[in-house]
Amino acid sequence: MEIEIDQARLYRKRQLHIILPVFLVSVIAYLDRVNVAYAGMTMSKDLSWLTPEIFGAGAGVFFLGYFFFEVPGALIAARFNACTWIARIMFTWGLVCGLMAFMHSQTEFYLYRFLLGACEASLSPVIYAVLFPKWFMAGERAKAISAMLTSLLVAAILGAPTAGWLLEMNLFGMHGWQTLFILEALPALLFTFVFLFWVKDRPEKASWLTPAEKAYLKDAYEKEQAKITTVRKYTVWQALTDKKVLRLCLIYFLWIVGFWGFNFWMPQVLKGLSGWSASLVGFAIAIPMGIALIAQVAWGNSSSRTGEKRWHVAAAMFIGAFGLGITPFVQNPLLSLGCICIAAVGVS
């Protein structure tokens, strides 16, 4: 006899035990990835070698480490335990983030940024390709992932004013940017252990599920995996030469250049245009991030309601490009903040 499952109750359970802790991991990851953008507002005063060119290269070196270790890390997690691997990712990136406070040379700056990328590399594929499929069926996954995607903007809303405030703290004789790196490394280090106890990598291990719920999720996952094996398999070369894949890669590349360029340079650009203090810049940046969060939810709902995808993406990218393009030509601080708001809506 088949036992009826309360789907709403089951989803609420997974919201608390899976989506919420993974959401917090994503928030912490974003904070530690881009805190260098805020530290850059004051680092150059204490590190004479830190030119804009070196800062930009160091910000980008992160993605070199990310590139080399993303796929291997995801394969390891798929073979062993996704939750243990996510905890490892968090702990190691927290250590590297803390070490950033003690860098003294250009080489160390590049090294730590590379290591940060290498440590964090497989986080997204492990979450979306390894952990979530075991907990959420195909029809539920979009809802779970959409909730996760808001984590970047939530992190920016909380992280920008926090970073600005920390930059004006000189604890134990350290500079503000050193304080920022050390204190923002702590959440990753501490939450590692919370995450290990909070999240299980598969339903069978979850004490908060009933036996029927465990069996239901396990059976749904196995059926989905069985269907996947019947789909045509592509070689790596076939995937890399597929025209649709190449077009999507180009679109994603063009968007990601604007997205990360905006995130890494926005604090310094606003500070340069306005002359405001680091703390005021931090609080000001929370405004465009808040507007972008509202726009992201509204834009996603509009796309889901109408079923239209291409023009929603194209319009957002155009808005972002317009905001980025006009910002350098605006000298008034409040108007420049308005331009940044436009850019944030588009690129986010």
Language-model features: locations:
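Extracytoplasmic gate region of multi-pass secondary transporters
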Residues: 36-37, 237-296, 300
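Helix-breaking motifs and short loop linkers at transmembrane-helix boundaries and internal kinks
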Residues: 49, 81, 102-108, 119, ...
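Conserved MFS/SLC helix-loop-helix module at the cytosolic interface between two early adjacent transmembrane helices
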Residues: 68-107
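Helix-to-loop junctions at the C-terminal end of transmembrane segments
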Residues: 69-81, 167, 295-308
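Cytoplasmic membrane-interface "Motif A"-like loop-to-helix N-cap segments
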Residues: 78-90, 304-317
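Cytoplasmic helix-loop-helix junction between adjacent transmembrane helices
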Residues: 112-150
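Glycine-rich segments within core transmembrane alpha-helices of 12-TM secondary carriers
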Residues: 142-167, 187-188
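C-terminal transmembrane helical hairpin of 12-TM major facilitator-type secondary transporters
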Residues: 307-348
